Swiss-Prot record:
Gene3D superfamilies: Jelly Rolls. This is Pyrimidine/purine nucleoside phosphorylase. The gene is ppnP. Keywords: Glycosyltransferase, Transferase. Its EC number is 2.4.2.1, 2.4.2.2. The lineage of its organism: Bacteria, Pseudomonadati, Pseudomonadota, Gammaproteobacteria, Enterobacterales. Belongs to the nucleoside phosphorylase PpnP family. It catalyses: a purine D-ribonucleoside + phosphate = a purine nucleobase + alpha-D-ribose 1-phosphate; adenosine + phosphate = alpha-D-ribose 1-phosphate + adenine; cytidine + phosphate = cytosine + alpha-D-ribose 1-phosphate; guanosine + phosphate = alpha-D-ribose 1-phosphate + guanine. One of its GO terms (cellular component) is cytosol. The keyword Transferase applies. It is an enzyme of class 2 (transferase). GO terms for molecular function: guanosine phosphorylase activity; purine-nucleoside phosphorylase activity; thymidine phosphorylase activity; uridine phosphorylase activity. It comes from Edwardsiella ictaluri (strain 93-146).
Length: 95
């Protein structure tokens, strides 16, 4: 089953799904902007297109991730994103 989500007045949209090979995940696109997300479970985020500038909890500085690069976000945390151009991502929800 697909779940469509929209955040930040439509600037971030995602489609969530359950996959036998990777478990629960979502794919989405972020428009240019700055965003703060919270997590319940640990997440693995992979950039598909564009670039994401991310401030991960516990990291001393912002980091830039480009297509094919992955970052991890701890459970029950908050992370910040700066997006300079429309960017796509794959998010895997880890247990």
């Amino acid at each position: 089953m697909l779940n469509v989500n929209e955040y930040f007045a439509g600037k971030v949209k995602s489609i969530g799904y359950d996959s036998g090979s990777i478990g629960r995940a979502s794919v989405g696109v972020m428009e240019k902007g700055e965003y703060t997300f919270t997590t319940d479970r640990p997440e693995e985020m992979t950039v598909v297109t564009g670039a994401l500038r991310v401030l991960i909890p516990g990291a001393p500085d912002w980091q830039v991730f480009t297509p094919g690069e992955t970052f991890f976000v701890p459970e029950r945390s908050e992370f910040n994103l700066q997006v300079a151009e429309p960017s796509a991502y794959l998010c895997k929800y880890l247990s």
